[in-house]
Amino acid sequence: MLDKNAKIYVAGHRGLVGSAIWKNLQDKGYTNLIGKTHKELDLLDAVSVRKFFDEEQPEYVFLAAAFVGGIMANSIYRADFIYKNLQIQQNVIGESFRHNVKKLLFLGSTCIYPRDAEQPMKEEVLLTSPLEYTNEPYAIAKIAGLKMCESFNLQYGTNYIAVMPTNLYGPNDNFDLERSHVLPAMIRKIHLAHCLKQGDWDAICKDLNQRPVEGIDGNSSKEDILAILAKYGISDSEVKLWGTGTPLREFLWSEEMADASVFVMEHVDFKDTYKQGDKDIRNCHINIGTGKEISIRELAELIVSTVGYQGQLTFDSTKPDGTMRKLTDPSKLHALGWQHKVEIKEGVQRMYNWYLGR
């Protein structure tokens, strides 16, 4: 167990997972938390990161900061996804080592697994065949991060644990229509289409003022607003989504991801992540997921039902689906003592309630 007064740095504490980890730590009575916004500390800047570690001397680190996005963003910003994530990891993990951090938790992604991996995916399938092309740069960066943790542990005896969460959603998610992941993107699209159907321009303007789309906000003309929404497949009568709707995905409520992360930080050490006596020590990362899946079409229909939208859902099969099935095997985590509780229907309702309350 960690001392409640231990100095804990949460990198990315304003993001989807980082904010949930921060809240979970506070709820558990931890009193000495450190968080820096991107404006206060640019994790891409090695000099600034070293200065931060020199000054703060954290004892424990949650590395939840990353450059992330959905299929569209991964397709467009390939260089950014590999370069920025490698740089963040290099800086934070490197300075954690140089400053003798007692324990580090690195958050990766299940996109590290091969495109055609056997389902559900066990940790052992890593690097056994090619990755999904659309998110290959991001996946390679995350694989490098987990291998950094593993390699530092093996060479220097550090205690860096890598966890691979499935698709996450929850409070403080990213709802940018170009860069967000599938679930928050669908919630926003269907919500805006519902507002159009209801003629609720106050709600539309409020939404766009909070999250402008390509420079269009609530002060723009109705014509400009309708045009930009149409570009993203949003109208009063229809919501168009990428792909066929047939891929299967697994989703985990972000606050549960945070609980699992804190559980691992408190109770799991590197020696617990592999079989003692193994000649080759690898695949020491831990999947964090539900082990349950839903199709993209079924998810969209669940969101339509939750929002109350009366229009049509259509799928653009000329756009990529990404991996057709991506389900984690969380049995390693279960054996260590943690399991999820929030199912997808309850989670989507919570998510939409949070979105409306912003």
Identify the function of each model-found stretch:
Residues 133-166, 182-199:
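Active-site Tyr-X1-5-Lys
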Residues 12-16, 20-28, 192-358:
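C-terminal substrate-binding subdomain of Rossmann-fold SDR/epimerase-dehydratase oxidoreductases
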Residues 4, 90-135, 161, 174:
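Conserved Rossmann-fold NAD(P)-dependent oxidoreductase catalytic core, especially the SDR/UDP-sugar
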Residues 26-51:
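Adenosine-cofactor binding site in Rossmann-like domains, unifying the SAM/SAH pocket
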Residues 11, 36, 61-67, 104-110, ...:
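SDR active-site strand-loop-helix element
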Residues 68-69, 110-118, 166-169:
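Active-site segment of SDR-like NAD(P)-dependent oxidoreductases
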Residues 82, 86, 134-146, 176-184, ...:
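Short-chain dehydrogenase/reductase
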Residues 46-86, 95-98:
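NAD(P)H-binding glycine-rich loop region in Rossmannoid oxidoreductase-like domains
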